[in-house]
Amino acid sequence: MELFDLPLIWAFIIGFGIIMYVLMDGFDLGVGILFPFAPSEESRDTMMNSVAPVWDGNETWLVLGGAGLLAAFPMVYSIFLPALYIGVFLLLAGLIFRGVAFEFRFKARTSRYLWNWAFAGGSTLAAFAQGAVVGAYIQGFETANGVYVGGALDWLTPFTVLTGLGMLAGYALLGSTWLIMKTEGRLQEWAYRITLPLLAGVLVVFGIISVWTPFVDDLVRGRWFSSLTVIWVLPVLTLLCAFQIFRSVRNRFEGMPFVATMGLFIFTYLGLIVSRWPYVVPPDYTLWDAASAYESQLFLLLGLLFVIPIVLVYTAWTYWVFRGKVRAGEGYH
């Protein structure tokens, strides 16, 4: 007899890991996206130093989410990877370029400009690939008997290009609000100045995606328009977060723009989950269809319940130790 609905528990754990990754690695990817446009080389140093203590720890959540997905829902892996080989490769290549550039830039002198572009390019590529993968998930996958039967480039459509651009804009907004909170002087003023145009861009792209999505998938269209459900609360909350970003930037608040931007991402993410629930491989397979054996999920869950609190405590401790402003000339390398 199964005492717990383990696929549901695992779905919550993996979903939590994904949103933690989006929020925590999103802002340092955003810093990388904004890197070429910084007002000075000194500002770029400060931007890197603002994320230096936390950027590699932020990626822990990607590992946690990916490993959990493989262990708990192997069918998802067996369909997603063949469908998204190129997209996932671009994502990982971007993260690798970003990581290498991060370390080498602090050591380089004559070639620093090359690592500047590698850092920005890797961040941009990783962010775009993440958005395109999300768009491919919304589109759904062509499957037969639990196997992907589509082509290698079926994921790449105008819709996924748009979701990739949306993720770029969203991460750039996270990065600019992070810089407002963590820096001061000329760099902070620059971050204030670009945040509202970035917010406008995010709202425009997200609006187009929201209008387009019901035409991409019948399930989403039916769920959105068959009745006025809780899903319509989420766009309202998202717009309230956008208004709070606008208001707090106009009033020169420092922490609230970043908090409100995280709220914008959270409510958008919840909207995606509610629109697709309970399908993990749309449009055919639910999380119960794709789940591994109950015994496997239970064994792995016991280990994960030990690991997650450690990761949470370490993450909280890191952010507490490195709280406060990062000033020009100060760094952790």
Q: Could you tell me what each predicted segment is?
A:
Residues 54-123, 144, 221-229:
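Membrane-interface helix-loop-helix modules in multi-pass inner-membrane proteins
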Residues 10-21, 79-93, 120-125, 154-168, ...:
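Alpha-helical transmembrane segments
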Residues 1-14, 68-84, 138-158, 219:
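Helix-coil boundary and interhelical linker segments in multi-pass alpha-helical membrane proteins
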Residues 31-53, 70-76, 103-113, 175-194, ...:
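Juxtamembrane membrane-water interface segments of multi-pass membrane proteins
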Residues 281-300:
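Short, membrane-exposed interhelical loops at transmembrane-helix boundaries
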Residues 258-266:
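Central hydrophobic cores of alpha-helical transmembrane segments
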Residues 1-57, 63-65:
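N-terminal signal-anchor module of multipass membrane proteins
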Residues 104-254, 271:
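Long, contiguous internal "core" modules enriched in hydrophobic/ aromatic residues
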